[in-house]
Amino acid sequence: MRRVLSVAFVASVMFASALIAAELKSGLQPGDAPPPYNVKDITGPSEGKSLCYRCKYGARPVVNIFARELTPEVVSLVKKIDGVVGENGEKKMAAFVTLLTNDPDKDEAKLKEIAKKEGLKNVPLTVFDGIAGPEDYKISEKADVTVMMWVGSKVKVNHAFAKGELKAANTKAIVADTKEILN
């Protein structure tokens, strides 16, 4: 009897965790217009400068990955998006990563190391000073990773993941969703 109850308890906890992850809402939602915000470019063409990539990319198809930590899973996602951007140059696709941090100077070397190690060519790694992120973007404090895709100044896709919830299957779905901003 104890074994049955233990199995039932574990199953209910797993179901509840999956439900919470599925319902995590973070960032701008489809239909919203992404407002400008400034980041410090660490690995992109404006390395060392503060700029607004949202403004620079204008109405182009854009993937913006907000992360509070660059875990191996996040790095894998960035590398895959880097490839998609490279394959869609004729459509002027763009992407950038915004690391949300309270210590931007401390994270610069790590970002440069990741970009070099992974051979990132199309996705600038940037830092935003403040773990909460740009206020107008409504990044949930429960979200470790928030991915937004927009084109023509309208968000088309949003994915959000709590700490440890971004998996390979999610990365595959995010990459597949880039078609929503490329058509």
Language-model region placement:
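Short active-site neighborhood of thiol/selenol oxidoreductases, capturing the structured segment around
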Residues: S50-V75, M93-T98
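Sec/Tat signal peptide C-region and signal peptidase I cleavage site
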Residues: S12-A21
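Short, internal strand/loop/helix patches
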Residues: N38, I114-I139
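Conserved helix-turn-beta segment immediately C-terminal to the redox Cys motif
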Residues: S76-F96
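N-terminal "domain-start" segment that seeds a small globular fold
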Residues: A22-L51, P72
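Thiol/disulfide oxidoreductase modules built on the thioredoxin-like
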Residues: Y57, D129-T171
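Thiol-based oxidoreductase modules, predominantly thioredoxin-like and allied folds used
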Residues: K91-K106, L120-A132
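Bacterial N-terminal signal peptides that target proteins for export
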Residues: M1-S12
